Amino acid sequence: SMMPYPELPANAQAAGDSMVAKTKNFCEQYIDPAQIDREAQIRDGVIKGLGNIGVLGLTIDKNYGGAGMSHFNYCRVMEVIGGHCGSTAVFVNAHHSIGLRALELFGTDDQKSKWMPPLAAGDKLAAFALTEPLAGSDAANVRTTAEPTPDGTGYVINGEKRWITNGGIADVLTVMARTSDPAVPEGKITAFLVTPDMPGFEVVEDRMEKVGIRGTATGRIRFHEMVVPKENILGEVGRGLKLALTVLDFGRTTFSACCTGAAKFCIERMVARANTRQQFGQTLGEFELVQGKIADAAADMYAMESATYYTAALIDSGADDYMVETAMIKVFASDQLWRITNDCMQIWGGKGFFTDQPFERMMRDARLNLIGEGANDVLRCFIANVGFRHVGTELKGDRIKAEKEAKGNANKLMSVWINRASVMSESLVNPKVPVKHEHLRYYSRRLSKQIAQFGRQMKLVLAKHQEDVLNKQFVQARLADIATELFMASCVYSRLTAILLNGTI
């Protein structure tokens, strides 16, 4: 159930409030986003300061030097940073959300005791090294290899990693490499903890020039006959791909929180400009088209905020699977922020086009969000295909019955099966969306009807295309967008219910 909307316990809320205030104060005093963009570097003092206030180890267990906060509160902090400086947000995300996350989730007690305290304090920096020249969206196509040493004490790693945030400056890197497996000709992916002082580790480029997020150190690194002790294996041998995908779920959630913060900043500036700029004898805010842009931005920001914190709470609850939810919020938040920054610049007009305003930088920074942590097109296909698996299982039995009824006639089989799918879909009962407040009754009925309609269409699409649906990316994208919109609407509905009932969210 998506209700009630998650709330933090009072002590966690207070701790989060304090951390949010501390982070906001630090950002305003010490982080100059224009300077960071101009110099293409986040100064050491800023990084050290983030470590001192606890940002770089926020969710890490206190036993290992962290603050022990929830993912929910971590997202609150990342929202603040994301609304202030895109480069700093991506730096923190690369270090904490994915860089040391594999160690936090899959490391042994000995590994955590050895590696985690300096990482949590910010004395050392982390990076997550998955991407390669041939392994971008296709994460399983890793070509970096790790072969056992003759004495069995370690692995020899050879290969190259590219576009790794913090890659050239990190002290500890989680590196994905392909290890031998007799059952799999190409081998399986394993995660290793790697340090730059290992012989054979080479930083080819420490700071690659980029369109946006210019302050982060995006590097290219190479491994040549680099020996890594077997004690540095994270998780199980051959289970690195699952580890990587789990880590990216956390990164997508904080990505969405950063997008939420940036969207809030843009909306504040949109409103300020609309209330003060006059043309044709009235303020811009009196024109309907301007009002529409602000209203759309506010609605989408509220949706991304609601869904981000719902998903963060889902992760905190210990749920087994949240891959689809994290993919949905990442796609929605990054898509909408791109549109919001564009509309913000439009409202600011010619003045917004100059570099003394932050909007061109924010647009350049926002563009990465549609690519990083999983390209949006790929994630749309993923969202749809996960849905196909569930619905396809339901339809499998009907397919068998249809084959018996058709008695070998292929044309009749298709007709019978689609007819059965249509009848079954029409018989679906609208899901019950709880009505806790009278003001939401209309929206409850509407949401319930739309969810049921979507379920029917999913069944009909599968009945029509069958296995070929895996090649129908236009269909997949449309279904993924509908599913995402329904998820966003459900999160908003749940949150509004909580607000109307007790006014505390």
Where are each of the predicted segments found?
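Amphipathic, small/basic residue-rich leader segments at the start of a protein or domain
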Residues: 1-94, 101, 105-114, 118-125, ...
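C-terminal helix-coil-helix/basic helical segment that borders enzyme active sites and/or dimer interfaces
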Residues: 275, 279, 302-332, 345-348, ...
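A short core secondary-structure module
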Residues: 154, 158-203
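Alpha-helix capping/hinge segments and adjacent helical runs
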Residues: 25-26, 54, 164, 213-214, ...
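Short Pro/Gly-enriched beta-strand edge/turn motifs at strand-loop
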Residues: 124-130, 201-206
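A structural signal for short hydrophobic beta-strand segments in well-ordered beta-sheet cores
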Residues: 144-148
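Glycine-rich beta->alpha junctions and the first turn(s) of the following alpha-helix
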Residues: 203-302, 368-369, 385-391, 400-487
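Short Gly/Pro-enriched turn/cap motifs at secondary-structure boundaries
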Residues: 134-137, 163-166, 182-183, 210-217
